[in-house]
Amino acid sequence: MKRNTRKIAIIGTGLVGSSCAYSIVNQGICEELLLIDINHERAVGEAMDLSHCINFTNTRTKVYAGSYEDCKDMDIVIITAGPAPKPGQSRLDTLGASAKIMESVVGGVMESGFDGIFLLASNPVDIITYQVWKLSGLPRNRVIGTGTSLDSSRLRTILSEMLHVDPRSIHGYSLGEHGDSQMVAWSHVTVGGKPILQILEEKKDQFGEIDLDEIVEKTAKAGWEIYKRKGTTYYGIGNSLAYIASSIFNDDYRVIAVSAILDGEYGEYDLCTGVPAIITRDGIKEIVELNLTEDEESRFAKSNDILRDYMKTIGY
């Protein structure tokens, strides 16, 4: 990827794509922002609206609508296109429809001569990220999904409300599927550098008996709690995409829980799942392998097995 440019394309200008675009423009993450949608006029409208807010920011981002052909010079292509789950469905239930969309999208982007980084949010994001890797032929470090980045943020928010601590002082990750089977590596969750398991043990009088499984379930179901109230989620995932894109351009070696293709890490091969990874200008610099407990390894493996079973339904 060229290191003297900052150009991003967003494919899909629905609520997630437009929220991501808004975050990118407000933060001045890129110099050029290309919007692509099956409804071209929708993309044109979003580009116009975003351009009109430039005077109220400290940045100058060129925002315009275009087509796949324009992706040739992009550094990052963000894909948010895909169907939203209907009531009662899981993210995995949208796989068939999402997979068909990706075949068209990735084919169009790659035909342009694109040679940058794919950043995915389309659900089920772990499997779709794997599919895009296969379809694109790009190195695995340059195909990244949002994975459990948002889940990890939700986890920290839930813990911060429980412990009365700023969520930015809490460190830890949800791993595995961005969905119902995700797990938390509790042995690596810290608050101000102190293990949370130690804190909960020492302060039982203050916090009582905390059911960690309930916290995991609350984290995994957070999206559905939002869905029940407003129909879908977009601010959190939009900001997650912008955050990852910023980390790529800034080459800041930030550790983020993303969908990454494993090739021996955690003893897994030919699988895309949510794991912490070091993000740089080249994409994923390194996958961080946490030393999981036996119970955590088992939960992580179960989540990965679910992903593998669904991968088979689209030929992988």
From Swiss-Prot:
PROSITE patterns registered for this protein in UniProt: L_LDH
Catalytic activities: (S)-lactate + NAD(+) = pyruvate + NADH + H(+)
Main location, first listed in the record: cytoplasm
Gene3D superfamilies: Lactate dehydrogenase/glycoside hydrolase, family 4, C-terminal (3.90.110.10), NAD(P)-binding Rossmann-like Domain (3.40.50.720)
UniProt GO cellular component terms: cytoplasm
Database matches in InterPro entries: L-lactate/malate_DH, L-lactate_DH, L-lactate_DH_AS, Lactate/malate_DH_C, Lactate/malate_DH_N, Lactate_DH/Glyco_Ohase_4_C, NAD(P)-bd_dom_sf
Activity regulation as described: Allosterically activated by fructose 1,6-bisphosphate (FBP).
Binding site for beta-D-fructose 1,6-bisphosphate: R156, H171
One GO BP: glycolytic process
Molecular function terms, GO-annotated: L-lactate dehydrogenase activity
Involved pathway(s): Fermentation; pyruvate fermentation to lactate; (S)-lactate from pyruvate: step 1/1
Residues the record marks as active site: H178
Subcellular location: Cytoplasm
Binding residues annotated for NAD(+), in chain numbering: V16, D37, R42, Y68, S104, A121, S122, N123, T146
Assembly description: Homotetramer.
The protein's role, per its UniProt record: Catalyzes the conversion of lactate to pyruvate.
Family per record: Belongs to the LDH/MDH superfamily. LDH family.
Protein name as catalogued: L-lactate dehydrogenase 3
Organism: Bacillus cereus (strain ATCC 10987 / NRS 248)
Organism taxonomic ancestry: Bacteria, Bacillati, Bacillota, Bacilli, Bacillales
